[in-house]
Amino acid sequence: MKTTIKNSRTQESVSYEGNETKKGTGETLSYETSKDIEVPERLIDQIIGQEEAVETIKKAAEQRRNVLLIGEPGVGKSMLAKAMAELLPREQLQDILVYPNIEDPNNPLIGAVPAGEGRKIVMNHKNKARSQDEKKNLFMMLIISFILVLGFMMNQFLAAIIAAGIIFLALQQFRPRTTVMVPKLLVNNEGRQVAPFVDATGAHAGALLGDVRHDPYQSGGLGTPAHERVEAGMIHKANKGVLYIDEIGTMKMKTQQELLTAMQEKRYSITGQSETSSGAMVRSQAVPCDFVLVASGNLQVLEGMHPALRSRIRGYGYEVFMKDTMPDTPENRDKLVQFVAQEVEKDGRIPHFSREAVEEIIREAQRRAGKKDSLTLKLRELGGLVRAAGDIAKSRGAELVETEDVIEAKKLSRTLEQQIADRYIVQKKKYSVFKSEGGEVGRVNGLAIIGDRSGIILPIAAEAAPAQSKEEGRIIATGKLGEIAREAVQNVSALIKKYTGTDISNYDIHIQFLQAYDGVEGDSASVSVATAVISALEEIPVDQSVALTGSLSIRGDVLPVGGVTGKIEAAAEAGIRKVLIPASNMGDVMIEKKYEDMVEIVPVETLGDVLEHALIGKGKESLIQRMQKISDIVPSIMKKPAMH
């Protein structure tokens, strides 16, 4: 995409070359379909674009270090944790048994044996108990038979039957319970070839740390022995393996403290987690829980983490910040080809992709990166697009997913924000909240982003009225503005003084973000606000077929903003014919082909460039000439610093 404009200050033609959506993918892999791509067996080799994190995980696995992974959702944090379980050194896994304690029933004993031996021990104890029961049953049957035979011989049939029944009940009542001596298999690692991986995300204290069942419905009846009511926690099941906790900062502080204790001691006793239950009276011996903790979350999670827990991870492990984009190189595009093949293999219900369909997925990865020369690493969302395209191809009975299926899948798998944005544009246009033709004083079509990349039209109106205060005028902005947005509006006053030469101390300038009920945050509307205010002060109409976005410095330079692709596409959907964006954002533009002929994209460097393209009417030329004179005068009258 190549766009040429004239710089309003120098009158020189300046060309800008942006990323083309038609840009060749240039993969080094040779393939016809994704079926030709070999999918690695090891999970660690399936992780895309996180080379630094992978190297850290390998070191952590080799030395059994804890890891804290911080990053955006969908960049591969849980996959890294699972891969670490495969990489852990092969150790002797253990089965954990809990035995009854004859001396103190509320303090069950704990035993650890090699994996696979636990079930054998339990079966041996059960067989012994069963053998004892059979002997006792045989003895009881002999006694009852003797009584019955004796009664028949003495012609006392009824008395013999009654006596046999009484003896049977008595023997049952006073029969010693040998079955209570059978241990319970708490953790079973039989047949496991790799270290256990336990996902404890969202687990409550009982599930994480272990618990003791305390009511008849849970424990199996009144009088159930204490050791049979003991339940292992996830920290015990992760012994010699990996315990993964996502969004660890949402966990209660008390639970984090107990988790820290388990990490330090590598053993943790199981007790009832409810203080008001009978299970709280039971406390087992310390149960082995020698696990590697892999915690994850976003940056906000750090605020909710216990300082000592984070210190433990940092002191005995690593902190890793995950990338959300990777450079757009042939090697990295090859990795996305591998990613498509992996997703097809994992799903198992969708057909493979043709080469052209894979290239369309790569182009979408470029768009979703949101910046030039980059590919997105939010692969969970990209995987959703792969599966949606596969579903479409499957529904039409195709053997391969083609480019048309991927394009159709983009519509099918739109995010909630994108669907809301589409309806927002239709509704606002229907009721003329924003306009896409004609000219109007003090009214500008700004552009904004909701969610990650869904653009919307943000109409802004400005009006200049005589100041109510005798001392000075004010800038009054409405529309639930956030802190950054309020500061951006305040900065506009300096630009108005510089570019118009107007003394605004005699005016109250009112700025309204029309129907912005959900609030406005960020400074990407600075250009729009400045244009609306200057239009209102000078009474020069703004072209309503133009939409604009960009941040402003107090010197009038247009600074880059995020989400330009989504904003441009939203403007095109709304019928806008020209969009002004910061010149430094031109490389980030990756709009869909269908929008290329619908809208003209104009890069701007200064507020003067913006006004030249946004304003219309007879007063425009005189304003721009006056602005140029003021811009030339201001530097010349500035005092030079004194030389000593």
From Swiss-Prot:
Annotated GO biological processes are:
protein catabolic process; proteolysis; regulation of DNA-templated transcription
Name the segments for region: Disordered: 1-30
Alphabetical UniProt keywords: ATP-binding, Cell membrane, Hydrolase, Membrane, Nucleotide-binding, Protease, Serine protease, Transmembrane, Transmembrane helix
Matches recorded under SMART domains: AAA (SM00382)
Which chain regions cross the lipid bilayer?
Answer: 138-155, 156-171
Q: Which InterPro entries does its entry note? A: AAA+_ATPase, Lon_arc, Lon_proteolytic, Lon_Prtase, LonB_AAA-LID, Mg_chelatse_chII-like_cat_dom, P-loop_NTPase, Ribosomal_Su5_D2-typ_SF
Domain spans labelled Lon proteolytic: 438-617
The EC class name is: hydrolase
Matching CDD domains: AAA
The stretches that face the Cytoplasmic side, renumbered to this chain, are 1-137, 172-644
Q: How the protein sits in the membrane?
A: Multi-pass membrane protein
Instruction: Tell me the residue numbers annotated for binding ATP.
Output: G71, E72, P73, G74, V75, G76, K77, S78
Q: Name one GO molecular function term.
A: ATP-dependent peptidase activity
The record's active-site residues are: S524, K567
Give a single Pfam family match: Sigma54_activat
Query: What does the entry list under GO cellular component?
Result: plasma membrane
Note whether Membrane occurs among the keywords.
yes
Q: Where is the composition biased (Polar residues)?
A: 1-18
Its annotated compartments are: Cell membrane
Tell me the protein family, please.
Belongs to the peptidase S16 family. Archaeal LonB subfamily.
Spell out the subunit comment: Homohexamer. Organized in a ring with a central cavity.
Relate the protein's function as given in its record: ATP-dependent serine protease that mediates the selective degradation of mutant and abnormal proteins as well as certain short-lived regulatory proteins. Degrades polypeptides processively.
Identification of the protein by name: Archaeal Lon protease
Source organism per UniProt: Methanothermobacter thermautotrophicus (strain ATCC 29096 / DSM 1053 / JCM 10044 / NBRC 100330 / Delta H) (Methanobacterium thermoautotrophicum)
